[in-house]
Design a protein with these regions (language model features):
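An N-terminally biased module of ancient metal coordination in phosphate/nucleic-acid-related enzymes
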Residues: 1-28, 296
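N-terminal cationic-hydrophobic initiation segments that often serve targeting/anchoring roles
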Residues: 1, 26-30, 66, 148-149, ...
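Catalytic pocket-lining loop regions of alpha/beta-barrel enzymes
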Residues: 88-213, 218-220, 224
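Divalent metal-coordination and catalytic microenvironments
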Residues: 1, 9, 35, 74, ...
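Active-site gating/metal-coordination segments in enzymes
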Residues: 16-124
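Well-ordered, non-membrane alpha-helical segments in soluble/globular domains
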Residues: 19-20, 54-60, 96-100, 137-144, ...
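Mid-to-C-terminal alpha-helical segments outside catalytic/metal-binding sites
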Residues: 1-8, 206, 210, 221-298
Length: 298
């Protein structure tokens, strides 16, 4: 953060990170971090005991966490049955949206945003309902049309804006479609190369007010380089190569991509922090640091 001039970070639960650890980081560094809640202990309980997973029980854990006042949102993604892949049980859109409704209700209760995961890193196999990382909605951003209509007062943020890794942009296009057609859907952009910013910034139904810069974990997603091609650089894991052992400088790469944009500084400031501060209701030292996005003249 000091290296790149980042004032504050929103912590999500990564591998081996826990809610308790994130809360401790927040407490130990006043004004530097806020944290999102993730259903971690119930998931571990299901894996340990073999009991049937339930969305209601997972939502109860999120409710208890948010009730502490230590968290500002829900993420990364929504809780899901950790044994889904092992069971080889298919789950359809209607069943999964019914599960997600439990988490959306908790978000509505506490007036916090949710994060909807879209994308995969390519280096390890995961499926719609197969494999250890089975996650049905991660391949289906268009489902958010229904969520946004059913829960118009809950802000939904697309993790990775449809591009977690690789050069493919199909899910990115679908995420743009949803964001442009709804008022409560936003896009996180940390793994976008520069050209991906062009369409949403030009779209009057998206614009800078719906984009949030952030990064993925970075510890094992290298940057690929293909000179003369589009994109010239992108993040991606290689399937036949072991995970890298150093800290990939994803932060520097990501900031370089957004730094190439020749847009008004106020718009850039919204993407780099103003939108996150607004959605997560983060207290700022001054009240007029960023444009007021509800003012169409701004």
């Amino acid at each position: 953060m000091d290296c790149y001039g980042v004032d504050m970070c929103i912590l999500t639960s990564a591998f081996n990170m826990t809610n308790d650890l994130n809360v401790q980081i927040v407490k130990n560094n006043p004004g530097k971090f806020v944290a999102l809640a993730y259903g971690e202990k119930y998931r571990q309980q299901v894996q340990r005991t073999g009991e049937d997973w339930s969305a209601a029980a997972a939502a109860k854990e999120l409710d208890d966490l948010l009730a502490t006042g230590h968290f500002v949102g829900i993420g990364e993604g929504f809780p899901q049955d950790p044994t889904l892949g092992a069971k080889h049980r298919r789950i359809d859109i209607h069943s999964r949206l019914d599960e997600i409704a439990h988490f959306m209700a908790v978000a509505r209760k506490y007036k916090v945003p949710v994060r909807y995961h879209v994308g995969l890193t390519m280096g390890y196999t995961t499926g719609f309902c197969r494999g250890s990382g089975a996650n049905p909605e991660t391949y289906n951003p268009m489902w958010v049309h229904d969520l946004a209509i059913e829960w118009p007062d809950v802000q939904i943020i697309f993790e990775h804006g449809g591009v977690q890794a690789w050069w493919w942009d199909k899910w990115y296009e679908e995420c743009l479609n949803v964001a442009a057609a709804t008022d409560n859907v936003y896009l996180e952009t940390g793994t976008w190369w520069t050209e991906l910013y062009d369409k949403p910034l030009r779209d009057p139904n998206i614009g800078a007010k719906k984009l949030l810069w952030g990064t993925d974990w970075g510890s094992s997603i290298p940057v690929e380089w293909q000179p003369g091609q589009k994109p010239e650089t992108y993040v991606c894991q290689r399937r036949k190569t072991p995970p890298v052992r150093h800290q990939v400088d994803m932060f520097g790469w990501s900031l370089k991509q957004i730094g190439r944009l020749n847009i008004p500084q106020d718009d850039l400031n919204l993407i780099l922090g103003g939108n996150a501060a607004r959605l997560y209701r983060i207290k700022l030292p001054l009240t007029r640091l960023f444009p007021f996005v509800d003012d169409e003249s701004s």
